[in-house]
Each structure stands twice: as C-alpha cells, then as structure tokens.
Amino acid sequence: MLDACLPTGENMAMGTTDSPVLHIRTARTARAEQAQDAAMAAALEAICFPPEQAASPTTIAERMATYADHFWLIEDEGGMLLTLVNGPCTHARDLSDEMYEAPTMHDPDGAWQMILGVATAPAAQGQGLATRLLRTVIETTRVHGRQGLVLTCLDDLVGFYARLGFVDEGLSASHHGGLPWHQMRLTLA
C-alpha cells in the first residue's frame, strides 16, 4: 500500500514546518477500513460528478474490493478524503464503458492502467492535488512496468491532462453518462 505525506498550501512553497500535512495512500484492504474508504470515495464521486457519471456506492465498493491498490487517495490530517484517482489494469488498449461497471475486468498483470475517475473535493480544488496524485499514479504505473495509462475526459479537461503528458487520441468509443469523451493516453514503455 502506498503511503506518503506532502505539505500543502502557501506554506509548502515557503518551506515552513507549520503547513498542514496531506497523506497519499491507496485504499485499505481490511474489510472494515475498506468499507470506510469506499463510503468516502462514493460520497466524493457524488459531489464531483452528475448522477449519470458518478459511480454508485455499490460500484465503488466492488471496484475497491477488486483492486484496492489502484485507488489512490489524498486525505488531510483528520482523515478527510480530498482527492481520489481510481481504475483497473487491463491488457485492452482502450477504455470501454463496461470497465466502469465490471470491476472483474481488472487484470493485476495488465499492461495498461485505466483511469476511471479523478475527483477533488470542491473546497480543495485549485491546490494542485489532482496533479500531485496523478503524478504519483504515473510513477507507480512506471515502477510496475506497465505500458502506460489511459483515461477519458470531456473537452474542457484535455489541456489539463496534456500538461501531464497525456496525448489526445480524439473522441473515444465511450459514451459513459451519455456524453462524448476524449481518450487520452500516456505511453511509458
């Protein structure tokens, strides 16, 4: 399980020691702790995405039970979930709609890390947390020797992911939530 700490806010830039500390970790695997992580993740999804795009609490719990090590979380010192990135690994090159609902598509030896969701609590947005967590996910994917990462996003986020090295491959076959999505790929190998 990944567990790292990082300072936040202006104090981080100034290098002071009184800055709040955030913890980056993967989801826990003990049943009671995982249920708590899943509930927090489902609540964050519900806040950050419209109902037709947000994963249900049941789907989040099933995903987490199947691939807890592929749920990356940033939480504050009090344990409040601020940012979440999650998705399965697979040998499929492209992200498909069925991956959103079928956690069993996860293959621990898969060549590609799919990203199904990136969510940051509204009060924590604009602090670079999603960028930091995605960089952690990218490095973890590299360390595990995978070919790369794939995600889909709406038009307004193409530039954000491009700044992290993802390449826009055009409109995806995915119509998750009834919307047109761009498929973005970051090839590592």
Can you name each region flagged by the protein language model?
Residues C5-L6, G15, V21-H23, L154-D155, ...:
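C-terminal "cap" of GNAT-fold acetyltransferases
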Residues V21-A41:
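A short beta-loop-alpha structural element at the N-terminal edge
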Residues P50-E77, N86-M105:
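Active-site rim helix/loop that mediates acceptor-substrate recognition in acyltransferases
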Residues M80, L84-A119, Q125, S174-W181:
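Conserved acyl-donor/pantetheine-binding loop and adjacent beta-alpha core of acyl/acetyltransferases
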Residues T120, G126-E139:
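Conserved acetyl-CoA-binding loop-helix of GNAT-fold acetyltransferases
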Residues L134, E139-L154:
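Conserved GNAT acetyl-CoA-binding A-motif
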Residues V143, D155-L179:
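Conserved active-site alpha-helix within GNAT-family acetyltransferase domains
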